């Protein structure tokens, strides 16, 4: 067996439709597009969301909400990630140095997810009630 002798199993690869190649092919002349109309023309068709001139759904419904610009610079930090920080002090800069949060992050909040085993000092970060209890139970402390 050689690479140049390999071929797919008989009948496993179906040939694509060859449109407009004569009446005998079954797909000649109009090529499966029917007669006349916008969809039969070259480049024909309507844009996404078009409902034939009726006011489309995306314009009938009211606008709502907004995209918070603060969300892009805020991060959640899991309790289990605190162990990845070198030294016992966790703040915004040490989290960035340990690649736990991105460089553009300005606010971080420690959440109760995973476990903290070593005592750590959390400085200048927001901390949830559950995370605060877990950090203090492990012998750590939170400084504002």
From Swiss-Prot:
It comes from the Bacteria. It comes from Escherichia coli O1:K1 / APEC. The lineage of its organism: Bacteria, Pseudomonadati, Pseudomonadota, Gammaproteobacteria, Enterobacterales. Signal peptide: none annotated. Coiled coil: none annotated. HAMAP family: Ribosomal_uL15. This is Large ribosomal subunit protein uL15. One of its GO terms (cellular component) is cytosolic large ribosomal subunit. One of its GO terms (molecular function) is rRNA binding. Residues 1-54 are annotated as: Disordered. Belongs to the universal ribosomal protein uL15 family. GO terms for biological process: translation. Binds to the 23S rRNA. Residues 21-31 have a biased composition (Gly residues). Keywords: Ribonucleoprotein, Ribosomal protein, RNA-binding, rRNA-binding. Part of the 50S ribosomal subunit. The keyword Cytoplasm does not apply.
